[in-house]
From Swiss-Prot:
BP GO annotations: respiratory electron transport chain
Keywords: Cell membrane, Electron transport, Heme, Iron, Membrane, Metal-binding, Transmembrane, Transmembrane helix, Transport
Transmembrane regions listed in the UniProt entry: 37-57, 96-116, 126-146, 195-215
Principal localisation: membrane
Binding site for heme b 2: 91, 94, 196
Signal peptide span: none
Subunit structure: The main subunits of the menaquinol:cytochrome c complex are a Rieske-type iron-sulfur protein (QcrA), a cytochrome b (QcrB) and a cytochrome c (QcrC).
Native organism: Geobacillus thermodenitrificans
Binding site residues for heme c: 43, 216, 220
Cofactor(s) needed by this chain: heme b; heme c
Name of the protein described by the UniProt record: Menaquinol:cytochrome c reductase cytochrome b subunit
Keyword Acetylation listed: no
CC terms in the record's Gene Ontology section: plasma membrane
A Pfam match: Cytochrome_B
Length: 224
């Protein structure tokens, strides 16, 4: 049944060459841990992507229960944590995954830097990678406020004060993030939720697509 469906689609769209090109792509010998033990350092990028996928899937589950409102945000998180089946596990995955993805990305960045993989002709991919790092940090910052507890509230106030200290555009950045520059309240929570769930993930997906396309085009760099 599935084979017939696949053949029907393949006859019209010729999809076999597309997935065969990916499936048959050979892993370079210098990045294969089976041949070189030190090649495990090349796994940090893939591990970063793997944890990112977990973050996306667990985040989609969390949005089914989370209420981005100052009166209900904490209660919705409490309900998710204590009443929803597997809610505590999924939230724990998202919580710890947020830290793990930064660690993996940091290790990946160190590998690229110390092996000189950012040099010509891969300068553009390095820039895209740095932008991905910044987006990930933004996701961590905006997500921290969403439980709407005291720790998150005061941490966000500190973060907004840091943003305000940016020369020239600092006050505008703070107003953009917080809504009301004087109060961390309903507008701040709503904006952080929108940025965390819509704006930054959209930017992340676009940057990751560009990152992977350039890797595919240029190949994986060896030590330089």
């Amino acid at each position: 049944m599935l084979n017939k469906l696949y053949d029907w689609v393949d006859e019209r769209l010729d999809i076999t060459p597309l997935w065969r090109d990916i499936a048959d792509h050979e892993v370079p010998e210098h990045v294969n841990p089976a041949h070189h033990f030190s090649a495990f350092v090349y796994c940090f990028g893939g591990l970063t992507f793997f944890v990112t996928v977990i973050q996306i899937l667990s985040g989609m589950f969390l949005t089914m229960y989370y209420v981005p409102d100052i009166k209900n945000a904490w209660e919705s998180v409490y309900y998710l944590q204590n009443e929803v089946a597997f809610g505590q596990i999924v939230r724990g995955m998202h919580h710890w995954g947020a830290s793990l993805v930064i660690v993996m990305m940091f290790l990946h960045t160190l590998r690229v830097f110390f092996q000189g993989a950012y040099k010509k002709p891969r300068e553009m991919n390095w820039i895209v990678g740095v932008l991905i790092f910044m987006v990930m940090m933004g996701l961590g910052f905006t997500g921290y406020l969403l439980p709407w507890d005291m720790k998150a509230l005061f941490a966000t106030k500190v973060g907004l004060q840091i943003a305000e200290a940016v020369p020239l555009i600092g006050p505008a950045i703070k107003t953009l993030l917080a809504g009301d520059p004087e109060i961390v309240g309903a507008q701040t929570l709503a904006r952080f939720f929108a940025i965390h769930v819509f704006f930054l993930p959209a930017a992340l997906l676009g940057l990751m697509a560009a990152h992977f396309l350039m890797i595919r085009r240029q190949g994986i760099s060896g030590p330089l």
